[in-house]
Amino acid sequence: MDDIIEILATVEIFKDLDREGLTRIAERCWRDRYNRRQTIFTVGDDSADVYFIKSGRVGITIFSESGKEISFRQQKAGEMFGEIAAIDRLRRSTSAVALTNLELFRLSDSDFLRIMRERPEISIRVMQRLAFLVRALSERIFEFTTYGVRNRIQAELLRLAKASGQRSETINIYPAPTHADIASQVSTHREAVTREFGHLASEGILEKRGRNLIIRNLARLEKMVNDVN
């Protein structure tokens, strides 16, 4: 139980809860484990549970009929996913896949909605999260309609840099995403990512060191993103 409470305390929507409030939620959670590449739910599923990540990473994706993967985002320990289906009671609009071995805590949609009704501060944080997702999707739509492949790859690197929370000109992203991960995020092929990474490395902007991806010149990367081509 203590490990559930510890993880719930790191989830953004529960930041205002005391230990008693967290304990009440923890008592309603189920523990799930998944192996790498195992599917948690798929587009069209009628499940509506909400998930909180204890350890590992989850990819939120859609697969086309031809099998091409379009990745929306990756989520890590302390984050939540699956809440949209819990709120609107419609079928899943995306798939969730374990990118690593994964441990989750699962809360039913009925318990999630009851908590939102009982705790207005949680409802407000859920709305703030949904607003964030809408803004992120709007940004993606702009990029796909305006940017070429190279700019989209650069924009994804910039997004990863900002998501790291580091406040310096040199950003260390760990673990480094694979070229295939980046490609699925920006709807291109792995070879295009490899070429662009090579170009950025030759310009002194990017460096791969073991499992670390180091952005050496954040300001220059941002300028390249804005120089649409």
Describe each PLM feature range.
Residues 22, 112-113, 221:
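A generic structural signal for short hydrophobic patches within well-formed alpha-helices
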Residues 40-45:
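Short phosphate-coordinating micro-motif centered on Lys-Gly-acidic
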